[in-house]
Amino acid sequence: ELEEKLYSYTKDVMIALKQAEVAPEIVQIGNEINHGMVWPEGKLDDNATEENWRSLMELYKAGQRAGREVLPESKLQGQRALGGENRLCREFLDRMIQMEAEFDIIGLSYYEQWHETYNDLRSNLYDLTERYRKPICVCEYGANKENIKMINDIVRSLPNGLGYGTMAWEPTRVLFDKEGNADKDLFGIYDALYKQYIKSDAQPVYEPPYVNTDTIQK
């Protein structure tokens, strides 16, 4: 019953967006679902059982079904708050594949205070592109003067064009002050990135990491 309600709700939202002619390019099922979604039925914790995994994936697939039916051209994205944590990313994605939960884009959150180092992020993203051959989006990060270029350069450097993009959380909060005035310094960084990467001959800033990613255990 819960799965059907999730399916119906997701379908209604997708239909409304389509009718308003604002159909999204990406449909994300849940938010940072490495801890599950729709608690308690879809909750995951460190001691998750097979039943916990099954319950979560059935809920995810209900949303997936609605998205595919209404907006077949849109891409499905699953988001995990595991930016630099390779072992946990692989475990989750392998579970999704095993349980026939679909994803067209690998979505990850990355906050440097929680999700390991920039080098861990880079190594993880390179490993995931090699293993799963899917586009990757860092679809949540806290933009500041120190990390905007770092994170965007890492994603942009992924091989075979698999760096799908980045999304700052929450743009109206980080890019503007309480009076609504734009932060010129942050906008300047994004302007420079646009000019850097709009060129067809732009080269990646980072070289692939020279590590054995099979041994990464975060």
How should these model regions be labeled?
Residues 1-103, 114-126, 131, 145-153, ...:
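Active-site cleft segment of glycoside hydrolase catalytic domains centered on the general acid/base Glu
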Residues 27, 106, 166:
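Conserved, mostly hydrophobic/aromatic
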Residues 77-80, 105-109, 137-140:
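Short, conserved beta-strand edge motifs with alternating hydrophobic and charged residues
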Residues 110-113, 134-218:
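Substrate-binding cleft of secreted/luminal carbohydrate-active enzymes
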